């Protein structure tokens, strides 16, 4: 959606809907970050299948998929109801959770941005945005000499000057550009 592709009749959307409706890789805690089949192929170490790692690393993909499902899929479907439950659980846990995995913050940003249109509950939006802002600011690698290694660059979360995270991070964003 960020790239402007919103035609839900497009074959790519239809394929996504079909996959999500199948509930493949959906567990009681969300969608798996990695799957057992990963271990059959050459891979980076973080792609090794681990159900324990999935419980943390799935936060980001689950939040993102929940936002997508709740915005685009049939409200009467089984996967919609599960996404609604998972989204509520994620939002309820945001303020107290300690570990978000590598993609958790980005997933939460997508879910919280969609929240005003989802009608899934009454949440304290300023508190949610405050927590996300805190997490974004804490996760961005401030040492530009370390940017050549794996780490969180400002552009991971800040895609434009209109981002709510831009004002507090303008200087570091400008260094990345």
Question: What name fits each language-model region?
Answer:
Residues 1-177:
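Preference for long, amphipathic alpha-helical scaffolds in soluble/luminal domains
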């Amino acid at each position: 959606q960020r790239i402007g592709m919103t035609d839900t009749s497009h074959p790519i959307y239809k394929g996504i809907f079909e996959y999500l409706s199948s509930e493949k890789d959906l567990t009681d805690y969300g969608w798996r970050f990695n799957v057992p089949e990963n271990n059959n192929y050459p891979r980076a170490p973080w792609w090794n299948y681990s159900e324990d790692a999935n419980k943390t690393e799935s936060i980001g993909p689950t939040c993102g998929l929940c936002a997508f499902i709740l915005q685009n899929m049939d409200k009467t479907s089984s996967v919609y109801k599960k996404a609604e439950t998972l989204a509520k659980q994620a939002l309820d846990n945001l303020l107290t959770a300690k570990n978000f995995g590598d993609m958790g913050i980005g997933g939460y940003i997508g879910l919280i941005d969609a929240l005003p249109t989802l009608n899934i509950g009454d949440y304290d939006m300023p508190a949610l945005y405050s927590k996300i802002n805190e997490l974004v600011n804490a996760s961005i690698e401030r040492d530009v000499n370390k940017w050549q290694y794996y780490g969180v660059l400002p552009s991971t979360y800040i895609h434009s000057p209109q981002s709510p995270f831009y004002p507090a991070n303008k200087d570091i964003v400008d260094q990345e550009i």
